[in-house]
Amino acid sequence: MKRERGRRGRKRVCSFCVDKATSIDYKETSKLRKYVTERGKILPRRISGNCAHHQRMLTTAIKRSRNIALLPFSTEA
């Protein structure tokens, strides 16, 4: 008896590659908020669907916007 392991969903496509973005601006908080959870954590690649190159750029952009208080580090609970 063969047992099915896990469920593989459809691979998500990097939204930045589709838009042919060369850089990710840290001042565009509306775009960055899509990749941050409500607890303030950055979504991983396997969930967001970004490629490795754009995930690194996204991480630095989120960290920069946190440092100048455009995005919160965490939510007040």
From Swiss-Prot:
Pfam family, one: Ribosomal_S18
Entry keyword annotation includes Cell membrane: no
Superkingdom as given in the UniProt entry: Bacteria
InterPro entries named in the record: Ribosomal_bS18 (IPR001648), Ribosomal_bS18_CS (IPR018275), Ribosomal_bS18_sf (IPR036870)
Keywords on record: Ribonucleoprotein, Ribosomal protein, RNA-binding, rRNA-binding
GO cellular component terms listed in the entry, alphabetical order: cytosolic small ribosomal subunit
Single GO BP term: translation
Molecular function terms, GO-annotated: small ribosomal subunit rRNA binding; structural constituent of ribosome
Described purpose of this protein according to its UniProt entry: Binds as a heterodimer with protein bS6 to the central domain of the 16S rRNA, where it helps stabilize the platform of the 30S subunit.
Quaternary assembly: Part of the 30S ribosomal subunit. Forms a tight heterodimer with protein bS6.
Homology family: Belongs to the bacterial ribosomal protein bS18 family.
Protein name: Small ribosomal subunit protein bS18
Naturally occurring in which organism (per UniProt): Desulforamulus reducens (strain ATCC BAA-1160 / DSM 100696 / MI-1)
